[in-house]
Amino acid sequence: MLERIKDSFTESIQTKIDAAEALPESIEKAAEMMVQCLLGGKKILACGNGGSAGDAQHFSAELLNRYEIERPPLPAIALSTDTSTITAIANDYSYDEIFSKQIFALGQPGDILLAISTSGNSGNIIKAMEAALSRDMTIVALTGKDGGAMAGLMSAGDVEIRVPSNVTARIQEVHLLVIHCLCDNIDRTLFPQDEA
């Protein structure tokens, strides 16, 4: 078991090294899009399932509260937090619509959808992206593996941040790091700090 634990650390480190080569430009572009969205008085909606739901909530909490610097709250909503809404939609319609119906109600042109799926194939995330596109929203997608069906929904104005791994746990670990990079870039751009 000790070797397996050590291997997990080694694999995680290697995946992050690979991601450090592949992802910085797309992370920077996504952060710039989010900054412009927020400067325009718009908001960011975030969604995911399971661990990715946790990531969506983590991102929203960092924006609504703070990341590492004191600053005003920023508008972000995790669509996975309202159990009454989610269970009503899943019961009355379908689980695939739990995020899309919220986007039709809350999403506005100029808002951003942060869509998170390690496989890129989650049905309710795909429906959420379709709803966002119909509302003239921009999409930032956090994916892994081959990007799945989500990759096919991306337009020129959207950004896919695809972790170079086929292992769900490694993808999730990098997704968290990407979220922290996004939050850091948003904060440092909107609220520059004296680095001295």
UniProtKB/Swiss-Prot annotation:
Location within or outside the cell: Cytoplasm
SIS domain mapped to chain residues: 34-196
CDD domains named among the record's database cross-references: SIS_GmhA
Cofactor(s) needed for function: Zn(2+)
One of the GO biological process terms: D-glycero-D-manno-heptose 7-phosphate biosynthetic process
Catalyzed reactions: 2 D-sedoheptulose 7-phosphate = D-glycero-alpha-D-manno-heptose 7-phosphate + D-glycero-beta-D-manno-heptose 7-phosphate
Binding residue positions for Zn(2+): 58, 62, 172, 180
UniProt KW Ion transport keyword: no
Domain of life per record: Bacteria
Keyword entries, A-Z: Carbohydrate metabolism, Cytoplasm, Isomerase, Metal-binding, Zinc
GO MF, one example: carbohydrate derivative binding
SUPFAM superfamilies tied to this protein: SIS domain
Family per similarity comment: Belongs to the SIS family. GmhA subfamily.
Remarks, miscellaneous: The reaction produces a racemic mixture of D-glycero-alpha-D-manno-heptose 7-phosphate and D-glycero-beta-D-manno-heptose 7-phosphate.
Name assigned to this protein: Phosphoheptose isomerase
Taxonomic lineage from the root: Bacteria, Pseudomonadati, Pseudomonadota, Gammaproteobacteria, Alteromonadales
Name of the gene encoding the protein in the UniProt record: gmhA
